[in-house]
Curated annotation (Swiss-Prot):
The gene is TAMALIN. The modification Phosphotyrosine is found at residue 237. Residues 101-190 form the PDZ domain. Its main location: cytoplasm. This is Protein TAMALIN. The keyword Phosphoprotein applies. The modification Phosphothreonine is found at residue 77. It comes from Homo sapiens. GO terms for biological process: regulation of postsynaptic neurotransmitter receptor internalization; signal transduction. It holds the Pfam family PDZ.
Amino acid sequence: MTLRRLRKLQQKEEAAATPDPAARTPDSEVAPAAPVPTPGPPAAAATPGPPADELYAALEDYHPAELYRALAVSGGTLPRRKGSGFRWKNLSQSPEQQRKVLTLEKEDNQTFGFEIQTYGLHHREEQRVEMVTFVCRVHESSPAQLAGLTPGDTIASVNGLNVEGIRHREIVDIIKASGNVLRLETLYGTSIRKAELEARLQYLKQTLYEKWGEYRSLMVQEQRLVHGLVVKDPSIYDTLESVRSCLYGAGLLPGSLPFGPLLAVPGRPRGGARRARGDADDAVYHTCFFGDSEPPALPPPPPPARAFGPGPAETPAVGPGPGPRAALSRSASVRCAGPGGGGGGGAPGALWTEAREQALCGPGLRKTKYRSFRRRLLKFIPGLNRSLEEEESQL
């Protein structure tokens, strides 16, 4: 049963309970009476709906269990009265309702049976510390328990003396000097619970700070062992992890795309691979040789001392008889250095792409600009030219 059906049912009951004026006056048709406004269901039907006050008065006749069941089935709520919004009672604004006065009586050789503790509450808004004395423990079958004292009660006064703000030792002396009868005014609130939660929060913050320091230390050790890096800023670790994942996904890290087999493809020029040095000038070097099919008359220059590749460059064999003079061979050296001169790890994708394009040694290979005419001349004199790869390795 929904709230709308309850309204209709209430209107029908009111219509049945109200007597019809035409039935009481038989001669109403001959002598029409003056229209008298009477409250009833027709007036209620003329309006869009009954007001909230009338609806509350109508719903009071129903049993609460039936009304709650109908509201639970329909999923509706009761209409709100204007000007009477529901408000939670703030217990901190009415402390007088929580105050209670207890009288404790004991024998000469007996104790009151409760323990107190003084705690300082820090108010950040007011920049002050409030000292609160509360009951931390009540013994079983003691005069304090029989009087109704409970753990958590804040002591406001002792024997009519206000003890708020008094030191702990002075409160203890006042209680001991009271004799066998003690009159306590207590206040039960949430201040003690707040103090306990605040202390636990500070403990958790301290633990979090210590664990975070251990985590940063482990991250530094991991990066030092895996990558050989020593970074003081822990924020760089996220960048390193993202770059490494991107390089692995694109297949640009060593191992995912070997650079050596790419240089040894049949039908393409051979050359050196990456230089094996662990210093800051570690980079990628590659040399391409171009020559004619005719055997050369002079042997090629010796390979450079600092270049480590998969093997020496292939040169055509010298024929047994004299032949025409062979064309001069050209060599080009390309240096692809990573940012920062890092040696062990992978280089960025742009540099590896440039190295692969240079490894293909296409016809449109751009010549390197030399700094002097002497170097350009020595390049075309076999036997006199120095290794360009060795010169580039010093940069």
